A protein has these predicted regions:
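Short amphipathic alpha-helix that is part of the acyltransferase structural core
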Residues: 1-25, 42, 138-140, 150-172
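A short helix-loop-beta-strand connector motif used in the catalytic cores of GNAT acetyltransferases and
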Residues: 30-40, 134
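Conserved beta-strand in the GNAT
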Residues: 40, 46-54, 59-66
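Short strand-loop junctions, especially beta-strand C-caps/beta-turns
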Residues: 65, 70, 96-100
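Conserved acetyl-CoA-binding loop-helix of GNAT-fold acetyltransferases
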Residues: 67, 73-87
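Conserved GNAT acetyl-CoA-binding A-motif
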Residues: 88-104, 109
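Conserved catalytic-core motifs of GNAT/GCN5-like acyltransferases
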Residues: 96, 109, 113-133
Length: 172
């Protein structure tokens, strides 16, 4: 699994700003959690895409969706998200995106909207994932339609406590 994990982590590093991913050791620690999963997409023995997610009682949370740079635009991300939506079996799926400030972030939001997700405009901050980074302003997208502000706060409390490992009321 170590070689596969190294490949997964390389895709994460190549796809996300460092403040949006954990350290190598921090990411590897997640593999021992019962609520954390990584869905992979491989072709001819090559890892081309990953989707890291959590399964909680009432919802699933996609933390990372990424494809190898050479495999982007091939529909792999769509297949991975569709697999998670199937796994959710009618439960809410949420994920975080950067605010729509440029063409890349707007395109990413449109990608998720094509898969049925709704952009929620409420304020949301990702707590620091490692000691060398700060908070990151993000927005939540949801698979079962728009969230009320109260619903988003309830999801944020779970993310704060179980994903970011901070006080549930952090930034609420």
């Amino acid at each position: 699994m170590n070689s596969l994990f190294d490949s997964v982590y390389k895709i994460m590093v190549d796809s996300f700003p460092m403040e949006e991913i954990r350290s190598y050791e921090g990411q590897k620690e997640l593999l021992s959690r019962e609520d954390y999963y990584i869905e992979t997409y491989e072709q001819e023995g090559q890892l081309l895409g990953i989707c890291a997610y959590y399964i909680f009682d009432d919802f699933l949370y996609i933390e990372n969706l990424a494809c190898k740079p050479s495999a982007r635009g091939l529909g792999i991300g769509t297949k991975l998200v569709q697999a998670i939506l199937k796994e959710a079996n009618g439960r809410q799926v949420i994920l975080e995106v950067e605010p729509p400030t440029d063409e890349i972030t707007k395109r990413r939001i449109r990608f998720y909207e094509r898969l049925g997700f709704t952009f929620n405009p409420y304020e949301h901050f990702q707590a620091p994932l490692n000691p060398t980074t700060g908070m990151v302003e993000l927005k939540i997208m949801s698979s079962l339609g728009a969230l009320t502000e109260e619903q988003q706060q309830a999801y944020r409390r779970v993310l704060n406590e179980k994903v970011y490992l901070v006080d549930p009321n952090f930034m609420i």
